[in-house]
Design a protein with these regions (language model features):
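Glycine-rich ATP-binding loops of the HATPase_c
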Residues: 122-133
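Conserved short strand/loop->alpha-helix "switch" segment adjacent to the catalytic nucleotide/phosphoryl-transfer site
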Residues: 5, 28-47
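Conserved ATP-binding N-box helix of the HATPase_c
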Residues: 41-64
Length: 143
């Protein structure tokens, strides 16, 4: 499957699409990223990987009838990349002092902290919302 012109991002998205498909998780993608990006390609792929990995893991712990992952990613203007990943979840989201705690082990979750750090390093931002069984992460990376 081909999702976008940027080969690195396309590979990441395709990998997680294949995993979701294998697990029968509905996976929606709206992505428009050109071959050449105004933002760091490695950082963009790290953000995509972290968010999609988290979404896949949360979906696997969600009742099969409610599972879904939705990815939206595109450029805004000449220097911003906007990424949003939504997924359903069952259970309790654990957060302490603005830091999400890992659902896999004791302590902080590394993935979302990494995403926040990458966004801030590029003078961007990341936000997380969760309500009524829907978890949403929005990331803005600046070039």
């Amino acid at each position: 499957m081909h999702f976008c012109e940027n080969r690195a991002a396309d590979s990441v998205v395709g990998y997680y699409c294949a995993l979701a498909k294998r697990e029968n998780i509905p996976y929606s993608v709206q992505i428009d990223l050109p071959e050449c990006l105004p933002v760091d390609e490695i950082n963009l792929c790290l953000v995509l990987s972290n968010l999609l990995e988290n979404a896949l893991e949360a979906s696997l712990r969600t009742a099969p009838a409610r599972r879904r992952i939705k990815l939206t990613a595109y450029l805004h203007g000449n220097s911003l990349a906007l990424i949003q990943v939504e997924n359903t979840y069952d259970g309790v989201i654990r957060e302490k002092d603005g830091v999400f705690l890992s659902s896999k082990r004791k302590g902080d979750g590394v993935g979302l902290q990494s995403v926040r750090h990458i966004a801030e390093k590029s003078c961007g931002v990341s936000t997380v919302t969760y309500q009524d069984g829907l978890f949403c992460v929005k990331v803005m990376l600046c070039g």
